[in-house]
Amino acid sequence: MRIFALVLLIVFGWLQHTLWLGKNGISDYYGVNNEIQVQQQVNEKLHLRNAEMFAEIDDLRQGLDAIEERARHELGMVKEGETFFRIIGEESH
């Protein structure tokens, strides 16, 4: 009976070691779970960026206001008949 109890104790110890420290054990589970959470955060940021880009694309397709705004700010263009004024602040000496 003692030998049987000893064998059971050894098997139980081996199973516990495998569960906690072995391949696909608890430690691997927590590591993969952390990686999943990090990747979900990255995916959420990319999803928001994509949504902004799609909104900008839709705006460019549907309206001339966005195109006009980009031409004014990025290219420095003005409409025909408009006068461009640049206001420069005073420099402190």
From Swiss-Prot:
Keywords: Cell cycle, Cell division, Cell inner membrane, Cell membrane, Coiled coil, Membrane, Transmembrane, Transmembrane helix. It is a single-pass type II membrane protein. It comes from the Bacteria. Residues 33-75 form a coiled coil. InterPro entries: Cell_div_FtsB, FtsL/DivIC. Residues 1-3 are cytoplasmic. The chain crosses the membrane at residues 4-21. GO terms for biological process: FtsZ-dependent cytokinesis. GO terms for cellular component: cell division site; cell septum; plasma membrane. Residues 22-93 are periplasmic. It is found in: Cell inner membrane. It holds the Pfam family DivIC. Gene3D superfamilies: 1.20.5.400. Its main location: membrane. Essential cell division protein. May link together the upstream cell division proteins, which are predominantly cytoplasmic, with the downstream cell division proteins, which are predominantly periplasmic. Belongs to the FtsB family. Part of a complex composed of FtsB, FtsL and FtsQ. HAMAP family: FtsB. This is Cell division protein FtsB. The lineage of its organism: Bacteria, Pseudomonadati, Pseudomonadota, Gammaproteobacteria, Vibrionales. The gene is ftsB.
